[in-house]
Amino acid sequence: MFEMPKVTRREFCESVAATAMLVTAIPVGATEAKSKPFIKWAGGKGQLLEQLSALLPKDFAERKDVVYVEPFVGGGAMLFHMLGTYPNIKKAIINDLNSDLITTYKVIKERPEELIAILRVMQGEYRSCKNESELKEYYLAKRERYNSREAKDVEVAALFIFINRTCFNGLYRVNSKGKYNVPFGKAKNPLICDEETIMMDSRLLQKVEILNGDFEGVEKCVERGGAFFYFDPPYRPLTQTASFTAYSIAPAMNYCESAA
């Protein structure tokens, strides 16, 4: 059985130094060009950004001091696209019901170097496994640690990203007891520690208020006038036994009308 990697002071300092060098090496404007979600997410709109952008108000780029709001942020494909493309967005407000996803957003915003230090160790240990059996054992050990709910914020974020990169098809699914149960994805050499993306996303998240709760509570945090809402609610479950959060169309429509 594998143990959760313990990052030594030396490893942490080396990671912080390397991360600082990485940030220095990123040219001006690179954030806008390369920013992208730090995880794969079911229903993500990364492949539809061009079509979605065409639906924006024609004068969006000329508007001043825009407040951009996403009540269902998920993987954040549209969020990072908007923040990287439109400097007139002075603030963004994002929300999601998944508390570990939101914890990961907050860690990337506030403590990216610590997150990278842990992910580097995980990536090195994962890639040092000799065969598929060892890879699976390592994955299951991390999944068990994640489900134990004993980890603190930075470790939670690292585990969340790790299982997203190494599970089957990047799925997030829990059983009736709230335990993450997606099987091993058999990836031999995944990019677990995407340092450049984490640091670029951290830059963009500096002007983002990050919320965790029901979407209907987001309106209370938004001042009237000037806010632009992007709604992308989660898909309804195909069966009554599927453990995905469902939203009916009526509450969402009522929310849109009240926020208008």
Task: Label the predicted regions.
Residues 54-62, 222:
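Glycine-rich helix-loop-beta junction characteristic of Rossmann-like nucleotide cofactor-binding loops
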Residues 198-224, 229-230:
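A mid-sequence, solvent-exposed acidic-amphipathic segment
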